[in-house]
Amino acid sequence: MASKQLKLVIITGMSGAGKTVAMQSLEDLGYFCVDNLPPSLLPKFWELMKESDKMDKIALVMDLRGREFFDSIEPALDELDNTNFITTKILFLEADDKVLVSRYKETRRHHPLEPNGSVLDGINAERELLSDLKGRSQLVINTSNMAPRELRERINNEFQTEDKDIFNVQLMSFGFKYGIPIDADLVFDVRFLPNPHYIDKMRPLTGLDEDVYEYVMKWPETQTFLDKLVDLLMFTLPFYKREGKTQLVIAIGCTGGQHRSVALTEFVGKTIQQKYETTISHRDMKRRKGR
């Protein structure tokens, strides 16, 4: 009998969110992939894989196409958690409702939960049914603003470096007027800070411009907030990592996502970057006309 540690990635999530693309990406990374395996067969499947000397990385797509999915997925995952030769990671893919509806319209497909009814009703039912599974997932990716190529790149970045024990912190600025990022783990509101938008010469600029950055940073309340925020993050990040998270999405928001949130996201990101693998993005900065 082979004595080795097997790696299992379970790909699940919303219908239309990109599970097929994720499976193909993992297949390219050397994973043996199985689509639509019934959850009740999962423990038996892994006993067979344990005997194989050729396969040590497996990816399974598991979703509501399997009729017994919702009844048997949780017990199957609990059993896997108690199996010492398997390291399990759940990859959950989701997207905003309007994006999923648009994708269904483009493909002219019916939602599997509402084959004769409203696509949106099916999406809402599926989202509710999957809420517990999403909560126990180690990696959640929102594909609303991703092309298939971008999702492949994201999967590659996550799983190519998996053996290096990478923990990625994503710092994102955003504007509350455009909605809170759906994939954010932590959200911080900086609308209490003085707003450069009301200074004519700064209005067309962003927090990446030196004048705006210095204006936002000069206030005592800004410095006090940053000291407390960085202290909080440096305290909590090791514990998020200990719980098995491979990424943590931190969103910092102001009104329009142009000035205050951009400046603070840059500062916090560059500070966190000194200790953790960090990516910085500004979701709404390009929404302004002419940029």
Curated annotation (Swiss-Prot):
Pfam families the UniProt entry points to: PapZ_C, RapZ-like_N
Key words, A-Z: ATP-binding, GTP-binding, Nucleotide-binding
SUPFAM superfamilies per the UniProt record, alphabetical: P-loop containing nucleoside triphosphate hydrolases
Source taxon at top rank: Bacteria
MF-aspect GO terms: ATP binding; GTP binding; molecular adaptor activity
Residues annotated to bind ATP: 13-20
Binding-site residues, GTP: 63-66
Keyword Ribonucleoprotein among record annotations: no
Covalent S-S links between cysteines: none
Family per similarity comment: Belongs to the RapZ-like family.
Function: Displays ATPase and GTPase activities.
Descriptive protein name: Nucleotide-binding protein lmo2474
Organism: Listeria monocytogenes serovar 1/2a (strain ATCC BAA-679 / EGD-e)
